[in-house]
Amino acid sequence: MAMRFLNIGYGNIVSAHRIIAIVSPESAPIKRTVQEAREHNALLDATYGRKTRAVIVMDDGHVVLSPIQPETIAHRLNNKEDLSEEGWVLHIYEK
């Protein structure tokens, strides 16, 4: 079984199989979601002070801010060959 990780910018990675949604931060409902996550200490800011271009919602309720466009992240997620070539696939073998 392989555990896939996804580069979301500036060397930050998230577990690919735990992503529920990758959305643009511009709409009011997403802004409210980000604010609620901040209030509940469930917000992870991976922008390094740059503009937030994507909001990633994880299956455990965490919200991750990324400086990369949602389309770029989705392309990386769908392109399995790029993930393995860049070293973002971790193979875990269970006994």
Swiss-Prot record:
Protein name: Putative regulatory protein BC_3870
Stored InterPro entries: RemA-like
HAMAP family noted in UniProt: RemA
Lineage: Bacteria, Bacillati, Bacillota, Bacilli, Bacillales
Originating organism: Bacillus cereus (strain ATCC 14579 / DSM 31 / CCUG 7414 / JCM 2152 / NBRC 15305 / NCIMB 9373 / NCTC 2599 / NRRL B-3711)
Family listed: Belongs to the RemA family.
